[in-house]
Amino acid sequence: MSDFFHSDVLSVSELNAFAKSLLENHLAGLWIAGEVSNLTRAASGHYYFSLKDSRAQVRCAMFKGAAARLAKPLKEGDHIEVSGKISIYEARGEFQITVNEVRLKGLGQLYEAYERLKAQLQAEGAFAAERKKPLPTRPQCIGIVTSLAAAALRDVVTTLKRRAPEIPVIVYPTPVQGAGSELQIAQAIKTASQRAECDVLIVCRGGGSIEDLWAFNEEPVVRAIEACTVPVVSGVGHETDFTLADFVADVRAPTPTGAAELVSPNRQESLHRLAQAQGRLKTVLEQRYFDASQKLDWLARQIRHPRQKLDEQRASIGKLAQTLSYSMKQNLRAHTARFERQTQALQHYRPDVSVCKNNIVRLQTALPAAFSQLLTHRRQSLTAQAALLEAVSPQHILERGFSVVKNTRGQVIRNADVLKQGQKLHITFADGETDVRVSKEQGQQDLFDCI
């Protein structure tokens, strides 16, 4: 730059280049407000127009890429705000703005309010991942907060019917743009939360200009989503549109259709996954069955059938029986041979058996007579001895008139001279007994007195 000031003379091109450098380096990032005039739209899709106010104007060029991002086409007389590259067209030395963005006049204040609320919510942790609620894998009911006339509602319902026709849908109708729409949207969200009829809630609307979507940047809507007890999926505008509702929602979908796809299990995909799982399960079960069959076959080979075991035992018993029979026959033959040998030996050394047999017969005949004679003799001898014993028995003597006299000690009194007067005696007769007392000495009359 100092080279320009030290030069004596500048060419026109140098002047224009210097001016262009100053403008591009020091006037970047500005927003310029004005009214559209002299609007021309080329066949290529570029816009050429002037932006003017009451005292001045500046030429503007908006190329096809930037023009495609417009919410709606520019028209003569629009009051807009533009941002872009401020420069000079060097060939003609014309001052111009190459426009990159366009917004309606007044949106600058809205954007400032947007940034303030966003910063506040950020500081409060409203966007924190840890407060996000997970979406249900298979919801039993899906709620939708949107306008009944919105194309977004048709898109969402069509997608849900295609993917999960068995899931019921509840619509909480509300205007989604216009004055006061933010309060009605917030109230619809609160109603869905209070009723707790749904497992997940879609808050959506179709695409539009920033002004059309602005209700979803308003604090009532953002606070209602933040306080909602039901997981919320936002599907506002197109994929390039971002609102504060997107930031505070539990999940942000790029479009309403995308929101419907997020909350609904794809029936075909579920059936496909189920078929795959079924196939894997079948493979596992078949492998387990094969392994079990192999193991069972191996065990069956290890375990003999009871009939086989019985046959083996029966065969073993048969062999043992044969062995035992053979052994018994052998023993019998051996004992028979031994008996025959001993019989032959006895026959060689025995006495005359017939003589002994005759003697035995004779003795057997004589034995009863001899025994009877002996018995008679013994009976006669016993009778004689009994008569003798009877003759000398004390009882027989007493029956002949005798008696037995005993003192008190049981001693028999054989002589009268041993008696004393007054002595007690016991006398035994043949037919009884009695006690007496000695009343007189020997030689006196009435020797005894009966007691």
Curated annotation (Swiss-Prot):
InterPro entries: Exonuc_VII_L, Exonuc_VII_lsu_C, OB-fold_nuc-bd_dom. The keyword Signal does not apply. It catalyses: Exonucleolytic cleavage in either 5'- to 3'- or 3'- to 5'-direction to yield nucleoside 5'-phosphates. One of its GO terms (biological process) is DNA catabolic process. It is found in: Cytoplasm. Keywords: Cytoplasm, Exonuclease, Hydrolase, Nuclease. PANTHER family: EXODEOXYRIBONUCLEASE 7 LARGE SUBUNIT. Heterooligomer composed of large and small subunits. Bidirectionally degrades single-stranded DNA into large acid-insoluble oligonucleotides, which are then degraded further into small acid-soluble oligonucleotides. This is Exodeoxyribonuclease 7 large subunit. The gene is xseA.
